């Protein structure tokens, strides 16, 4: 799949970048790859990754997706791009929405444009459930990032570069997520702070996130959006599961929802479900390839609009306490934290 190819990962020192590199190294995929380029802003994280991985095929590029020239330079002779660079903290983006716009929208446009100009074969854009029916700045910026990618796909149907989107639910134990917060609170003998006990979130592992991107890479066509079917849990059950795993007696304290938070998340809208293809573990949402010449569609007729329920963390499979414990105990992060407890 990647034999003698050059890959670029934007935001490559983040959770996804570390996870996909771990997969490539563990499965010995990297021996067939020509080069993997890690593009990010943080030189310290790059240095840490360089020392930890110590692999000559992994190259590091300091730059910011907000700066077109830096991403264009890194894109030279690249075959495939995984675009993971983003601002993803919901409350932070609420206070600094222009920063979300600059990174998640304008930065994404720079990546997509550079990929087109440099004739990259395929670009996988990493999005989020918060882009569906968005109510916060982060979700809105990611929704527009998706629109940029699909618009590029629509305009590049006959060109070389293929653009696909993947949407994540909550990636467990990723940087800035709630699981590391709860574990730190347990270890420091503090109250576990829960925003709203009945709030539900999809539960994906970092392994799942890599599987989703690689599936989209292998099977995605121009303008496809891919979503992995995922179970969900309430935040309270998640906290209690970690209490049980770490044998903790810490109290749970409810603090109320934060800026921009939703009670539940949607991975596929009802409008998208009407045209989605069920692929077993995944949904594929094909691009609407029509152009602006609507007159011909009135002549041809339109497909009947199907009314389907959106796919949400409220109507997906809901895990009970023991099931959440089992899921958490399979995470490398939780296993490491247990060893160090």
From Swiss-Prot:
Key words, A-Z: Isomerase, Lipopolysaccharide biosynthesis
The UniProt record lists the keyword Isomerase: yes
E.C. code: 5.1.3.2
Record Gene3D superfamilies: NAD(P)-binding Rossmann-like Domain (3.40.50.720)
GO molecular function, one term: UDP-glucose 4-epimerase activity
Presence of the UniProt keyword Isomerase in the record: yes
Family: Belongs to the polysaccharide synthase family.
Functional summary from the UniProt entry: Epimerizes UDP-galactose to UDP-glucose.
Name of the protein in question: UDP-glucose 4-epimerase
Species annotation: Rickettsia bellii (strain OSU 85-389)
Designated gene of the protein: capD
